[in-house]
């Protein structure tokens, strides 16, 4: 299940970013400021906090292959039950689209790792998405 409507996005996986001298390791989806973000998978919350790059973000491990990062959420939008160690189900609300951290406008930074390796969210979601 996609965490938000993914019809509009502005930066894809693997795009070179000269300003940071690095590749973009996720997909920036733009469903609109304040849109509810849901968990794309069942799993366990690894972290729900603020960082300079991802802003307010949630990281969920699916217990098998993937760790999923949801970044740039509105301050205060992460529900109180979304804390490290909490169990989430696919479709559970985990926050709202915002523009916190290193962000140029409202969007969801959606990043998936297989172990320590970032993978293209399109490939994973096209293979496993049910919604």
Question: Locations of the language-model features?
Answer:
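Surface-exposed, glycine-biased beta-strand/turn segments
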Residues: 1-56, 90
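Short amphipathic beta-strand/extended segments with alternating polar/hydrophobic composition
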Residues: 4, 8, 69-72, 119-126
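Residue-level recognition of beta-strand microenvironments
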Residues: 12, 48-49, 73, 97-100
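Zn2+-dependent peptidoglycan hydrolase active-site motif and core
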Residues: 22-25, 39-80, 106-112
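Short, conserved secondary-structure segments in the cores of folded domains
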Residues: 25, 33-36, 78, 84, ...
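Conserved, short, structured surface segments that act as functional micro-motifs
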Residues: 57-61, 84-131
